[in-house]
Curated annotation (Swiss-Prot):
May play an important role in fibrillogenesis by controlling lateral growth of collagen II fibrils. Residues 994-1003 have a biased composition (Gly residues). Belongs to the fibrillar collagen family. It comes from Bos taurus. The lineage of its organism: Eukaryota, Metazoa, Chordata, Craniata, Vertebrata. This is Collagen alpha-2(XI) chain.
Length: 1736
């Protein structure tokens, strides 16, 4: 036997060496588990565990927000293999088309990828760019996105790629790559996504591996697997566990034994080979020699498994009890078939790196091939923690796997020991064949597992001793380890049977006072009693019952929020809600359940060996033991019958209290139980809601006047009566004490108008109420007296545009305004001429250190550096401090419904809720024992009248009465007295215009009215006849330059003048007259109230209004006489309830009975409990003004205040962050004159010189071409308030309005009176005499007793202390306008309010005064082709030009009319002689006139061309066309060139408009979509503010942004710091709409925004959190798109600047930034946001 064992050792060593020598070239490159490399087991954001292909497998569910990537070099440090296999097990979301894995180079080129969906794409591009995209392999007709699990293998070899799906489909496609393809590993590998692509992988993945060579892909299907249920299966490579794994490997060359040798059994001792690729601990076996027919009896268990077909559906995992040196045993048939030579590895790991959660389902126990015939036991309950096991000989109990330890180096095989002496036969035989175990309970926490190689005896010798030395050693070590097999708590048991009935409890404590009972029936109306003494201050009473429905009132103000509604029925369990904001830290909870098993810890140091412990108590039965020693082979037995179930086990220790189970379904209704005894009277319930009103009874006949009854309780308010006659004024009563303010009552009817009160202190302005609905139009009332000056109203709704008004007169000069805010930076001016170079100044002193410069632009990306040498491993650092809590992650997918939690602490007693709906009948309770009879309690106080009795018996049906005849109409009633004045009706609809009245009498001559507005300019008059020539006037001032005329015909040659010097710039021209009226603007803000108008004439008497509200309650009447005393009647016994009768008709009110006699005073009773709240007393008189209350809570944000006075200058702020590039600066000041330079070379012809002295007035020149359209000017300042207009005439009285619509039905009426008592029922059987009952609970308050005799009036008590302020009452009706209060002292200037919303566009203001000359604006876009302008005034005579070239001979001109003779002009300077020109054609002879005198200078400046009325294209002056084109013959027949000019002008204008649409200019009228568009159309534009309209369409919603052309055309929107979050506005402060921002994102590729914050303590204590526009939370720790471009916190000074630059455009702009929880009150700590810039 020893020799045989050594043979095995040698054989295994030879096999191992052969395997190593035959290993392929990539043996140095290990297989790569991509999931482990991307840290899937750590469950990063967007990844959570899920069930794999088999219930026990672990897969990972990947959702959209996951961002999983790693450097490629980290996975493939030795380079990416040329030929490789890619294996995965995946289940993708149905309909998905997304990448599973993408590998990028360092330059961002996609080199490798697998895209799932329909079709499946394999992407590959080597260093030469091959294959080209058209040649990329596409597997059409295949889909991996169908929601099912698929095993996918991709084999890449040479020039082809093969796709294997589920071991069934195998498709090969060509892959034309280069001969030596190389993939760059300096980039990144990304799971489930592509850069700048929105499609991401969503689904489950169990395995993703890349293995060098293609064998792994083909052999992945050669392995045989059974179904998940009940057999062996392959564990995926990426889940090392305690289970044996098989992984495909290269087939080593087999050994062939010589034919003459006997086959030798393989050694059962495994050989460890320390092969440690990253992420794997692999144990390899040798390969069995290739032989046939092993001899029975010699065969031992081996590690390979026979090939089986691949699984069809689910596969389950297998847990193998480790045996001594046998990790897997399979049985083969008697024929001794060959176990396959194994092309497999076996991965074996100590401990448990296999994190399995309870939700994955229980792991299934091992089921061997021959145990299939055994009976399957029932599923066991979850076990409790067992006691430490006692290991019997031959048994080894294995706990669940512990954490995975590191693989040790293999030791050399030990020498086989000598067999021990033959011992006595052991008592215990080998265990029998195990039956099918029941389903495991949930796994317990991990125990300790030890694998010890036991010695095997020889197969043929006698049976040796059961316990060998090694086994005894194993038992000792196992006893020290105390294998822990405690499981988690078992499931909750079933509900137990009801316990026996308990004894009756002891009498309880006296209960609290009951709530106020129901309100009694309404008493008769009593006489008005005398004024009583002031009562003690009562508690607020409950609301009274609902009154009779009144007439519909006017719509009231918005009410307070209503009370909560009745509790609804319990709904179904809702979906899991979105993750809420983190709440405040709670109190320490109870100790939680055991957490998940943590990651593998570092191996600890070996401890000293412990002493042998005492023998433990017997444990619970363990799993099936190890297989016993083989006995001599007996004949195969037949299958035995199923064994009987064993005896029940010992009672386990009770488990810990389980969590409450979920609420069960409602059970079926039980049978009706026996009638219980009447229970104790319950506590009085809270007031119920008012009942429905009863039917209105018929009116009764009027009864006789009965004697006056006692004063009853205050009844409900009666219906509104007609106004009675005024009674006698009663005596003034004593002033009562001030009562507490009651709860606010319902809103009463409007009272009559009170007397005018004294002038009150001006109150603070109340909050604006909500806008009420528009009322119906009432009749036009008389004009009222002039109102007082009201406060300035809020900004109204913009009205319709009015008609254009006439031009008003110029307003008087206003007061100087406050200094305005800094204006926006002006446009770039024209560059000035460079000044002469100055002399060199003296050297200045050394300047101070400048501030820190702005961060420069990011430099170009450097080339990737080479790998540095690996440094030595550092010492293990101390554990760092606990970091701050991370941000809440994004919202995860809905988790499974959680278990019901423990019941919470009982809350405080809630207020009495509304009456709930009648619940379903509860199940009958357990019948309690009959209680002892209680003692007879004292007689309770008289209770309230009981509820209405049950209906009486059915009365006899009366005979139907005859229908009465219709009565005659009664006489007309006398006209009633005038009712009180009614409420003012709604204004009626506007009446039709009345007929014109007759001419009135001539009135007195009124005072002179204010000057009327300037009239509109009249039409241009016809030209007057020419006057005589006036005397020559004084030379006029220099006139403005005229518009440039069209180029004239070359003139005759003039004399050459001397060259003039450069002139100075001329003065600014005069302002032009006002332009035509503009389009009517939108309504402006409400102006200041004007002075009160004159008193209007007295109007006609109005019609009677509707009846007014009822008047106030009259004074208290005199006390009536006391009635006679009545005798008290005997109290009768209380009858039993009869059967409920039908509701009878309502009886008449009986007369009040006489007053009873005064009863004797009763004995003084015990002090009662505190009474219930009484009904609400009448409101007391207003108390004195209380002291000022504490400051109230912060109210809602008020409307924006007006702009306050300019505040004092603030302290110097911190340096701001680097802003966007500024606009180009203004030109610098002109430099000093330089020294005289040398004479230059002859220059080109200079420009026209400065204007010369004014020449004589020339003829009108032709109309010039229109100039370019300028930028829109700023709106002028508003004009001053004009003088007050005269009062308007009195309007005619309008017609009566139409009758109103019927009102809505009133509320339901009150409950009817209680019905009569039913008939008395039969007497019940007498009950047993009860015991003395306990003291009863306090009875309901008795009925109101008869009033006592009126006592004498007591002395007035002292004034009570002022009560606390009551609750705020409902808003009262609007009072009259008070007198104006005295002018208060001017308050201090308020803080500057936030900038208000932009106002509506105002009316066109009056023409402003002439402004200062503006800076020269930017060159505007070319304007539309205008019509030809009118002829301008003659310009000043220019300096003499250089001699022109000889012109072309002109055509002969027409003969001109003769001019009047003029005076001879002064002789001009002699010009240079010109070159002789060619002879012109002979002109027609004109009438030669003598030269005329120069005309007088004009007094009136003629309109400049820009001031002429603008002509439309359709109003071209034909006569002007004739003048302007002298070649046109007079008459201008149709079809002449003059007729075409209008057509060409229109075409030109159309062309320019289209050009503006194609090439927008960035103005308000021609906005671009983005700044990128502007840059493309006008690359010469400088950085600055321009108008954009991303959504196109109407340009009214365009907004102004900063265009950063320097950065490539970024569109930048500026934020505004609001109270709760940042909002985004354009350059003028108007908010940018959400739609415009959305379009801006759609038009952009990326966006960036800077955030800066000071380095305060808060910034260092808690991280900055940002909330993006898509509500996602961003932080520098979690987002890869946030870069820190300046860190001022390292130096403890300055600010830190972060830049968010993201392709996920939905994340910007940032809406909130805080160091606290987002959405909480902001703790921004000085956070500043820069503009958000979108790059198109």
């Amino acid at each position: 036997m020893e020799r045989c064992s050594r043979c095995h050792h040698l054989l295994l060593l030879v096999l191992l060496l052969l395997w190593l020598s035959a290993a392929p070239a990539w043996a140095g490159t290990a297989p790569v588990d991509v999931l482990r490399a991307l840290r899937f087991p750590a469950l990063p954001d967007g990844v959570r565990r899920a069930r794999g292909i088999c219930p026990a497998d672990v897969a990972y569910r990947v959702s959209r927000p996951a961002q999983l990537s790693a450097p490629t070099r980290q996975l493939f440090p030795g380079g990416f293999p040329k030929d490789f296999s890619l294996l995965t097990a995946v289940r993708a979301r149905p309909g998905l088309q997304a990448p599973l894995l993408t590998l990028y180079s360092a330059q961002g080129v996609r080199q490798l990828g697998l895209e799932l969906g329909r079709p499946v794409r394999f992407l590959y591009e080597d260093q030469t760019g091959r294959p080209q995209p058209p040649a990329q392999p596409v597997f059409r007709g295949l889909s991996l996105a169908d929601g099912k699990w698929h095993r996918v293998a991709v084999a890449v070899k040479g020039q082809s790629v093969t796709l294997i799906i589920d071991c069934k489909k195998r498709v090969t496609r060509p892959l034309p790559r280069s001969a030596r393809p190389v993939l760059d590993t300096r980039g990144v590998i990304i799971f489930g996504a592509r850069i700048l692509d929105e499609e991401v992988f969503e689904g489950d993945i169990q395995e993703l591996s890349i293995i060098p060579g293609v064998q792994a892909a083909y052999e992945s299907c050669d392995q045989k697997e059974l179904e998940c249920e009940g057999g062996w299966r392959e564990r995926p490579q990426r889940q090392p566990s305690h289970r044996t794994q098989r992984s495909p490997k290269q087939q080593p060359p087999r050994l062939h034994r010589p034919q003459n040798q006997e086959p030798q059994a393989q050694s059962t001792e495994s050989l460890y080979y320390d092969y440690e690729p990253p992420y794997y601990d692999v144990m390899t076996t040798g390969t069995t020699p290739d032989y046939q027919d092993p001899t029975p009896g010699e065969e031992e268990g081996i590690l390979e498994s026979s090939p089986l077909p691949p699984p069809e559906e689910e596969q389950t995992d297998l847990q193998v009890p480790p045996t001594a040196d046998r990790f897997l045993t399979e049985e083969y048939g008697e024929g001794g078939t060959e176990p396959p030579a194994g092309p497999y590895d076996y991965t074996y790991a100590y401990g448990d790196d296999y994190h399995e959660e309870t939700e994955l389902g229980p792991a299934l126990s091992a089921e061997t091939a021959r145990s299939e015939a055994a009976a399957r036991g029932p599923r066991g309950l979850k076990g409790e923690k067992g006691e430490p096991a006692v290991l019997e000989p031959g048994m080894l109990v294995e706990g669940p796997p512990g954490p995975e330890g590191p693989a040790g180096f293999p030791g050399p095989p030990g020498i086989q020991g000598n067999p021990g002496p033959v011992g006595d036969p052991g008592e215990r035989g080998p265990p029998g064949r195990a039956g099918l175990p029941g389903s495991d309970g949930a796994p317990g926490p991990p125990g300790t597992s030890l694998m010890l190689p036991f010695r095997f005896g020889s197969g043929g010798g006698d049976k040796g001793p059961v316990v060998a030395a090694q086994e005894a050693q194993a038992q000792a070590i196992l006893q020290q380890a105390r294998v822990a097999l405690r499981g988690p708590p078992g499931p909750m048991g079933y509900t137990g049977r009801p316990g026996p009935l308990g004894q009756p409890g002891s009498p309880g404590m006296k209960g609290e006072s009951g709530d106020l009972g129901p309100q009694g029936p309404r008493g008769p109306q009593g006489l008005m009693g005398p004024p009583g003494k002031a009562g003690r201050r009562g508690r607020a009473g409950a609301d009274g019952a609902r009154g009779m429905p009144g007439e519909p009132g006017v719509k009231g103000d918005r009410g307070f929020d209503g009370l909560p509604g009745l509790p609804g029925e319990k709904g179904h369990r809702g979906d899991t809600g979105a993750q809420g904001l983190p709440g405040p830290p709670g109190e320490d909870g109870e100790r939680g359940d055991d957490g998940e098993i943590g990651p593998r810890g570092l191996p600890g140091e070996s401890g000293p060996r412990g002493l042998l412990g005492p023998k433990g108590p017997p444990g619970i039965p363990g799993p099936p033991g190890v297989r016993g020693m083989d006995g001599p082979h007996g004949p195969k037995g037949s299958l035995g019958p199923q064994g009987e179930p064993g005896p029940p086990g010992q009672q386990g220790t009770p488990g810990t209290q389980g969590l409450p189970g979920p609420q069960g379904a409602i059970g079926p209704h039980g049978e009706k139980g026996p009638r219980g005894k009447p229970g104790l009277p319950g506590m009085p319930g809270s007031d119920g809601p008012p009942g429905h009103p009863g039917k209105e009874g018929p009116p009764g006949t009027k009864g006789n006047q009965g004697p006056s009854g006692p004063q009853g309780p205050l009844g409900y308010p009666g219906p509104r009566g007609i106004k009675g006659v005024d009674g006698i004024r009663g005596l003034k009563g004593h002033k009562g004490e001030k009562g507490e303010d009651g709860f606010p009552g319902f809103k009463g009817d409007m009272g009559v108008k009170g007397d005018r009160g004294e002038v009150g202190v001006p109150g603070s302005r109340g909050e604006d109420g909500p806008e009420g609905p528009k009322g119906r139009t009432g009749p036009t009332g008389d004009p009222g007296p002039p109102g007082l000056m009201g406060e300035k109203g809020k900004l109204g709704v913009p009205g319709l545009p009015g008609y254009p008004g006439r031009q008003g007169p110029k307003g008087s000069l206003g007061f100087p305004g406050f200094p305005g805010a800094s204006g926006e930076k002006g446009a770039r001016g024209l560059s000035g001429k460079s000044g002469p170079r100055g002399e060199r100044g003296p050297t200045g002193p050394r300047g101070q250190r400048g501030p820190r410069g702005a961060t420069g632009k990011s430099g170009a990306k450097g080339t990737s550096g080479g790998d540095g040498p690996h440094g030595p491993p550092g010492e293990r650092g101390l554990p760092g401090p606990q970091g701050p809590n991370g941000f809440p992650g994004p919202k995860g997918p809905p988790g499974p419904p959680g278990k019901d939690g423990l019941p919470g602490h009982p809350g405080q007693r809630g207020e009495v809720g509304f009456q709930g709906k009648t619940g379903p009948p509860g199940p009958p309770g357990v019948v309690g024992p009959q209680g002892a009879a209680g003692e007879t309690g004292p007689m309770g106080e008289r209770g309230h009248p009981g509820p209405p009795g049950p209906p009486g018996e059915q009365g006899l049906t009366g005979t139907a009465g005859k229908e009465g005849t219709k009565g005659d109409p009664g006489p007309p009633g006398a006209p009633g007295k005038d009712g009180p004045a009614g409420l003012r009706g709604f204004p009626g609809e506007r009446g039709l215009p009345g007929t014109a009245g007759g001419p009135g009498l001539k009135g007195n001559e009124g005072p002179a009215g204010p000057p009327g507005p300037a009239g509109s300019p009249g039409e241009r008059g016809s030209a007057g006849s020419g006057g005589p020539i006036g005397p020559p006037g004084r030379p006029g001032p220099q006139g403005p330059p005229g518009a440039a005329g069209e180029k004239g015909v070359p003139g005759e040659k003039g004399p050459i003048g001397p060259t003039g010097r450069d002139g100075v710039q001329g003065p600014v021209g005069l302002p032009g007259p006002a332009g035509p009226p503009g389009v009517a603007g939108e309504d402006g803000d409400k102006g200041e109230v004007g002075d009160p108008g004159q008193k209007g004439a007295k109007g006609n008497k109005g019609e009677h209004g509707p009846p007014g509200p009822p008047g106030p309650i009259g004074p208290v009447g005199q006390p009536g006489a006391a009635g006679a005393d009545g005798e008290p009647g005997a109290r009768g016994p209380q009858g039993h309830f009869g059967a409920k009768g039908d509701e009878g008709t309502r009886g008449f009110n009986g007369p009040p009975g006489p007053i009873g006699l005064q009863g004797l005073p009763g004995p003084s009773g015990e002090k009662g409990e505190t009474g219930d709240v009484g009904p609400m007393g009448p409101p007391g008189p207003p108390g004195p003004r209380g002291p000022a209350g504490p400051n109230g809570a912060d109210g809602p944000q008020g409307p924006p205040g007006g702009v306050g006075n300019l505040g004092p200058p603030g302290e110097k702020g911190e340096p701001g962050e680097s802003g966007s590039p500024g606009v180009q600066g203004e030109p610098g000041v002109k430099g000093p004159r330089g020294e005289r330079g040398e004479k230059g070379e002859t220059g080109q012809a200079g420009e026209a010189g400065p204007p010369g002295p004014k020449g004589p007035t020339g003829d009108d020149g032709p109309k010039g071409n229109p100039g370019p359209v300028g930028f829109p000017g700023d709106p002028g300042p508003p004009g001053e308030v004009g003088p007050r207009g005269q009062d308007g005439a009195k309007g005619d009285r309008g017609e009566d309005g139409e009758p109103g619509q019927p009102g809505s039905p009133g509320p339901t009426g009150e409950n009817g009176p209680p019905g009569p008592l039913g008939k008395r029922g039969p007497a019940g059987t007498p009950g047993p005499e009860g015991r003395q009952g306990e003291k009863g609970a306090k009875g309901d308050p008795g009925a109101v007793g008869a009033p006592g005799k009126t006592g004498p009036v007591g002395p007035a008590g002292p004034a009570g202390k002022p009560g606390p302020d009551g609750l705020r009452g409902l808003p009262g009706s609007v009072g009259q306008q008070g007198r104006p209060g005295a002018t208060g002292q001017a308050g201090p200037p308020g803080p500057v309010g936030p900038p208000g919303l932009p106002g509506l566009r105002g009316d066109t203001g009056a023409k402003g005064e002439k402004g200062h000359p503006g800076l020269i604006g930017l060159i505007g876009p070319p304007g539309e082709q205008g019509e030809k302008g009118d002829r301008g005034l003659p310009g000043p005579q220019g300096s003499t030009g250089q001699k022109g070239e000889t012109g072309i001979p002109g055509a002969s001109g027409p003969i001109g009319p003769g001019g009047p003779p003029g005076l001879p002009g002064p002789a001009g300077p002699k010009g240079a002689k010109g070159a002789t020109g060619p002879a012109g054609p002979k002109g027609e002879k004109g009438v030669q006139g003598p030269p005329g005198h120069p005309g007088p200078p004009g007094e009136v400046i003629q309109p400049l061309p820009i001031q002429m009325p603008k002509k439309t294209r359709r109003s071209v002056d034909g006569s002007r066309l004739m003048q302007e084109d002298e070649a046109v013959p007079t008459g201008g027949a149709p079809g002449s060139p003059g007729g075409l000019e209008e057509i060409f002008g229109s075409l030109d204008s159309l062309r320019e408009e289209i050009e503006q649409m194609r090439r927008p200019m960035g103005t308000q009228d021609s906005p671009a979509r983005t700044c990128q568009d502007l840059k493309l159309c006008h690359p010469e534009l400088p950085d600055g503010e321009y108008w954009v309209d991303p959504n196109q369409g109407c340009a009214r919603d365009a907004f102004r942004v900063f265009c950063n052309f320097t950065a490539g055309g970024e569109t930048c929107v500026t934020p505004r710091d609001d109270v709760t979050q940042f909002s985004y506005v354009d350059s003028e402060g108007a908010p940018v709409g959400v739609v415009q921002l959305t379009f801006l994102r759609l038009l952009s590729v990326s966006a960036r925004q800077n955030i800066s914050y000071p380095c305060s303590g808060e910034a260092q204590d808690s991280p900055l959190k940002l909330r993006g526009a898509n509500e996602d939370e961003l932080s520098p720790e979690t987002s890869p798109y946030i870069k820190e471009i300046r860190d001022g916190c390292q130096t403890q000074q300055g600010r830190t600047v972060l830049e968010v630059r993201t392709p996920v455009l939905e994340q910007l702009p940032v809406l909130d930034a805080s160091f606290s929880e987002l959405g909480a009150p902001p703790r921004r700590g000085g956070v500043l946001l820069g503009p958000v810039c979108f790059m198109g």
